[in-house]
Amino acid sequence: MYQFLIIVILAAFVNGAQEKTECQQHRERETRSRAPLPLRLIPECDENGEYKPLQCFKDSKFCACWDKTGQPMTEPKQGIKACECIVQRETVQKIRGLIGAFTPQCEEDGKYSKMQCHGSTGHCWCVEQVSGRNVTAPVRGRLEC
């Protein structure tokens, strides 16, 4: 009986260790691929095994923003530095039923615009460009960031 229990535990451990996320499987496939590197993107996965928002082509200046499921949200282009703003903006735009929902304004490089304004309320505030974290309180009207 004791040996049977050990075998079951080992089988469960081995089976659990083999389960990989879609991103991890995709990364392995691309790592093994023989396609030329400039044409190939080896996806980066986060600690949970989901796709990281910023995905860049190896040995290239071209990057794109992807959602957690591996769907590209932007075309690959040079100069993309961050994707949190683009991911947040696209998520809000997919949920069209939220009248009055705040949609962040993003720069061409994917960072948050320094000044964010809520179209429904007329309030504006300054944010940290990479994280989107507020650095000023919202005020009515525009302000200098």
Curated annotation (Swiss-Prot):
Domain named Thyroglobulin type-1 is located at 20-73, 82-145
Question: By its UniProt entry, which InterPro entries does this protein fall under?
Answer: Dev_reg/Prot_inhib, Thyroglobulin_1, Thyroglobulin_1_sf
Q: Which UniProt keywords apply?
A: Disulfide bond, Protease inhibitor, Repeat, Secreted, Signal, Thiol protease inhibitor
Entry annotated with the keyword Repeat: yes
**Which residues are the signal sequence here?**
1-16
Q: What is its main location?
A: secreted
Q: Name one GO cellular component term.
A: extracellular space
Compartment annotation? Secreted
Where expressed (tissues)?
Answer: Expressed by the venom gland.
What the entry lists under Gene3D superfamilies is as follows: Thyroglobulin type-1 (4.10.800.10)
Task: List, in alphabetical order, the Gene Ontology terms for molecular function in this entry.
Answer: cysteine-type endopeptidase inhibitor activity
Disulphide bridges:
C23-C45, C56-C63, C85-C106, C117-C124, C126-C145
Q: What does this protein do?
A: Cysteine proteinase inhibitor.
- Protein name, entry field: U20-hexatoxin-Hi1a
Question: Lineage, please?
Answer: Eukaryota, Metazoa, Ecdysozoa, Arthropoda, Chelicerata
